[in-house]
Amino acid sequence: MKQNYSKGEIINANLGIPPKEIKGHEQGMERPCVVIKSFNNLELAIVVPLTSKEAKYSLFTIVKILKATAGLTADSYALCHQIRTISFDRITSKRAKLDNKDILKIHSVLIDTLEL
């Protein structure tokens, strides 16, 4: 049975192994990501990768996600400047669902980042 995903779900995804599958500052390895949009019939999802490493610099494209509100093991940061489309084949598991407040924060930052 094929899996379906929805906006705001936190999933684990294999984003590639450096250096062969990752270039420059792209996020890689298996990591949690937030589903922004799922195209279930195409088995594709637009995701924002998460990291637990606090940035050494301030970017308006980074949204802090508290572990208590997201079912994560550590406070994390949504890297909205790293948005990408992935195949469902890259998704290894579902983790949790973001609360509406965090989904709206990410949505707002994506509007600014993508100049929509």
Protein language model annotation of sequence segments:
Residues 16-20:
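Short, charged beta-turn/beta-strand-edge "cap" motif at the junction between a beta-strand
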Residues 22-30, 35-69:
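Compact nucleic-acid interaction/catalytic patches
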